[in-house]
């Protein structure tokens, strides 16, 4: 069984490509079924395992399979599922086998692979991915163990290093950008579209600047109202967005929509109604909520999640000592996991040996019972039984020694000598 991680992230692909391979939450379970099916068949020795992690910054497929062509099969599946030409997708995809897959999972959960170094949101996102895969029946021994250790390593890294200290979050970066456009956020009206965790973080940071007005527009009215009331704001229906957009100086959007909810025409009308006063817009969604053409309008300052990443990275350099500590912890834990994985690889062999030995035992016991039933001497039957079992049990090792090449025979002799030295002990 081999572990494999296939994916793209903010290091390897722009948001324009990442949004095309994102998985909406409701699509993940059925996607897992079709993903696993590429390895199901008469040649599969064990059931494949899979999990899908899809966030603003990454789409990753975690797999455990005995298919030697797993890498190519997984990339081709991702291409077909999202109707993307393989030539367009493949250059941006990373494929990480075995220890590389383990190391990657540990680094992702610890915040070392995030756009915001040390951010904690990814842990919750990974736990959601694991929960969804478990509910879909897609997890097994290997991925369960991988993710259990992943979360333990993330906890160890965050509790023993300063990896998350003084980090600049995406929400804080959005405020900094707004302050470059407007002298004071306190003089501006702010609209948040969505009511998820990222919008909640952004609302917290913007509310600290005491804007003139804070408004939340959300598809679910109750959730939008609840979030707005936390910050002494108000909520409006999402359906009113086109007619109310011109009222706001700052617009931050992050929904789970698979299609843009703010089009070029709506923003053009808003700019005209505002008499060309600037609008600062932040699109943190993947797939994007705001049509990218909006950024070409003269009076609109549109930033995506990738744009904010440049500001976030400014604060990453000061925490390189913590990164080195975290990497050392992760490397040790990777070696520990690989030792467990190596031990697991022996289990099928041991199970097969037990099965074969039991088949031989049953056959010889059945033969001995027939001999006893016809009146043969019990002592002679026991002697025949023991000789038959001895001959059959040593037939395999003897045959292997006889067939071994000269360069392998010495190694086999040494291994078997040590084996029979221990297994032949009569100590009680």
UniProtKB/Swiss-Prot annotation:
It catalyses: (S)-4-amino-5-oxopentanoate + tRNA(Glu) + NADP(+) = L-glutamyl-tRNA(Glu) + NADPH + H(+). The gene is hemA. GO terms for biological process: protoporphyrinogen IX biosynthetic process from glutamate. NADP(+) binds at residues 194-199. Substrate binds at residues 55-58, 114, 119-121, 125. The active site is at residue 56. It is an enzyme of class 1 (oxidoreductase). During catalysis, the active site Cys acts as a nucleophile attacking the alpha-carbonyl group of tRNA-bound glutamate with the formation of a thioester intermediate between enzyme and glutamate, and the concomitant release of tRNA(Glu). The thioester intermediate is finally reduced by direct hydride transfer from NADPH, to form the product GSA. It comes from Paraburkholderia xenovorans (strain LB400). The record marks 104 as: Important for activity. Gene3D superfamilies: Glutamyl-tRNA reductase, N-terminal domain, NAD(P)-binding Rossmann-like Domain. Its EC number is 1.2.1.70. CDD domains: NAD_bind_Glutamyl_tRNA_reduct. Pathway: Porphyrin-containing compound metabolism; protoporphyrin-IX biosynthesis; 5-aminolevulinate from L-glutamyl-tRNA(Glu): step 1/2. Belongs to the glutamyl-tRNA reductase family. Possesses an unusual extended V-shaped dimeric structure with each monomer consisting of three distinct domains arranged along a curved 'spinal' alpha-helix. The N-terminal catalytic domain specifically recognizes the glutamate moiety of the substrate. The second domain is the NADPH-binding domain, and the third C-terminal domain is responsible for dimerization. GO terms for molecular function: glutamyl-tRNA reductase activity; NADP binding. Keywords: NADP, Oxidoreductase, Porphyrin biosynthesis. This is Glutamyl-tRNA reductase. It comes from the Bacteria.
